[in-house]
From Swiss-Prot:
UniProt organism field: Macaca fascicularis (Crab-eating macaque)
Protein name: La-related protein 7
Gene that specifies this protein: LARP7
Stretch list, region Disordered: 1-28, 188-368, 410-440
CDD domains: LARP_7, RRM1_LARP7, RRM2_LARP7
Domain RRM: residue ranges: 125-203
Transcription listed as a keyword: yes
Cross-referenced PROSITE patterns: HTH_LA, RRM, XRRM
MF (Gene Ontology): 7SK snRNA binding; U6 snRNA binding
Amino acid sequence: METESGNQKNVMEEESTEKKKEVEKKKRSRVKQVLADIAKQVDFWFGDANLHKDRFLREQIEKSRDGYVDISLLVSFNKMKKLTTDGKLIARALRSSAVVELDLEGTRIRRKKPLGERPKDEDERTVYVELLPKNVNHSWIERVFGKCGNVVYISIPHYKSTGDPKGFAFVEFETKEQAAKAIEFLNNPPEEAPRKPGIFPKTVKNKPIPALRVVEEKKKKKKKKGRMKKEDNVQAKEENMDTTNTSISKMKRSRPTSEGSDIESTEPQKQSSKKKKKRDRVEASSLPEVRTGKRKRSSSEDAESLGPRSKVKKIIQKDIIKEPSEASKENRDIEISTEEEKDTGDLKDSSLLKTKRKHKKKHKERHKMGEEVIPLRVLSKSEWMDLKKEYLALQKASMASLKKTISQIKSESEMETDGGVPQKTGMKNEKTNSEECPTQEKVNATGPQFVSGVIVKIISTEPLPGRKQVRDTLAAISEVLYVDLLEGDTECHARFKTPEDAQAVINAYTEISKKHCWKLEILSGDHEQRYWQKILVDRQAKLNQPREKKRGTEKLITKAEKIRLAKTQQASKHIRFSEYD
């Protein structure tokens, strides 16, 4: 009994130790991969290829006397945040680094070797890639181009506003030979791609034009549909050919049987109905079971079709007796062959499954050279620079022509305004314009002039609707110059042209109160003066706001857009003829 209890205790202890080990295994975090990723990222940041392009990090190194950079700076980078935010873990990962070294405290790092001059063959080692997928990233490009050599630097331009990639990238290799290899192996543009390389995306205010994307997608869909239709047509033709072949063979087989049936149909009608029924039953039972007997029957019928009718009947009965035995033999042979095929097929399937399992254990995204053909266009950077020069020259020429057309449109519009009016009326208009212009300029310079009894205060128990809705409800009664309202406010002010207009709105309070629960009152006294001061202060603040200076191409494009909008507005206007015209 004691031995049994001792054995049970040992078993229990072993189980508890196993459970503890399992718990420890679960608790253990996978740090090796994280350490390797941290070391790789920091080595890249402090490498020659990156520091020659990364101005911020280079300046941080130059600022410090010893060339040390604090690890806390690296933790602030987004890519490092994804890996870790622990400075000690970063220091641990960089102990065995070949590029950087730690200080004695383990809180700062620096390059082991000083940064040299920028290499001159950088452009020759760099490759330009276009027709990239929409959600492309550095790891994808490194995986694809890493087959051709050691990728040192990858640059993927993005739109500033949206953050989407522009569809092209630059890949820098360690040697010129590797870059040439990438151009040779990975330059496989699809048939749909434009003949001339070089993507210079069309943008409006540094944003991709969505309409162009939609058009491109529609074109791609149409092409796909066309291909599918062609494939369907080819398949349909093949099927038709197969059906015609089968029908021809059937026709060949059915000719003798039809002749036999003709002979049978020519029999006199003196035969009794009982014999006919028996014959029909026998034929119906024999036909579905066996198809192979048709040839023998047809051949016998062909041979003896000219003989007497009684002989034909005897031959048919003999064939019917022979057919089942032949069919049973054939069925046995077929069953044996199918069993053999099944055995061989099972063996093949099992071997294939084993090989698939082995492949799945490895990384799924590994690709060997030549296995997949990625539709990319790859050029040397020097070729791309030549294309860029051509593009800039074309842009310059187009902008010059646009400038000329804008100046011509302006001169034509001035000629129309001056030449279209008679001289006498023109003189009067000049005087009136000269009188009106200074007054308008004064109003614009000083802002709205103080007029008492023009401002109406609107108070609501609930947040007021949008400015447009308030304006529309008031404009139905009288002309509104301005509505001072912020979203979610329960109070607002409306400025009218004359005190009579404001009074008309107050008089129509009953009509407004039916639709909206508003309280209306005209401002007067100190409240009115304070509000007018507020108007002037707000106006001055608006004028003092910094404006974006548009120069060069942007300035020209904005001018052209304004002219286009003005023309469209003129075209959309209704031409109204008077009764006497």
